[in-house]
A protein has these predicted regions:
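Alpha-helical membrane segments and adjacent membrane-interface helices in multi-pass membrane proteins
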Residues: 1-13
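A generic hydrophobic-helix recognition signal that picks specific residues
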Residues: 1-4, 22, 26, 55, ...
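Hydrophobic residues within alpha-helical transmembrane segments
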Residues: 3-6, 28-32, 60, 88
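Charged, low-complexity, helix/coiled-coil-prone segments
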Residues: 4, 15, 32-40
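Residue-level recognition of specific faces of alpha-helices
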Residues: 6, 23, 27, 34-37, ...
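Juxtamembrane helix-capping/reentrant segments at transmembrane boundaries
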Residues: 11, 15, 19-33, 79-85
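A feature for the membrane-embedded catalytic helix bundles of lipid/isoprenoid biosynthetic enzymes
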Residues: 34-149
């Protein structure tokens, strides 16, 4: 995940500096970003720490947020980055939370009677991605809708 974040930050910058940026490069960049999102979050969703339903809800939220950004560009409103938990933010969270989960695991069940909730840091991250990314996608949609008049 860390390597993905570093490479994602560098690829566009290198293309601009070398003056070789192109629409095809932008297409490849966005496509590979979504593939990376699906692989990373799919691994988390299919892992043992997160309920698969919550994991896939996070994937849907992430993909909808990214889609709204690129769809704005497609309809002529310009690329839209508004809202919380954009790609850079998510990559930071995806580096920090698994690290905290690994080194600072806390049994959340001790705070809930009868242990009905089997929560951990990864589960909380996926809930946050599902909810915040979906709300940010709606925010982007509304902003784009307003701009299009």
């Amino acid at each position: 995940v860390f390597l993905t974040a570093v490479l994602d930050a560098l690829d566009g910058m290198v293309a601009r500096i070398r003056e070789i940026s192109s629409r095809r490069g932008d297409l490849i960049d966005h496509t590979l970003d979504r593939v990376a999102d699906i692989i990373i979050m799919g691994g988390i969703a299919l892992g043992s720490l997160v309920d698969i339903t919550v994991g896939f809800a996070a994937i849907i939220g992430i993909l909808m947020l990214s889609y709204m950004g690129t769809q704005a560009q497609a309809v002529g409103a310009g690329r839209e980055y508004a809202g919380l938990l954009g790609r850079a933010d998510r990559l930071v969270v995806l580096v920090l939370v698994p690290t905290i989960q690994h080194f600072g695991y806390q049994d959340w069940n001790q705070y809930f009677s009868e242990g009905y909730l089997d929560w951990n840091y990864m589960t909380l991250m996926c809930y946050a991605f599902a909810i915040v990314c979906t709300l940010s996608a709606f925010y982007r949609f509304n902003k784009i809708w307003t701009e299009l008049g």
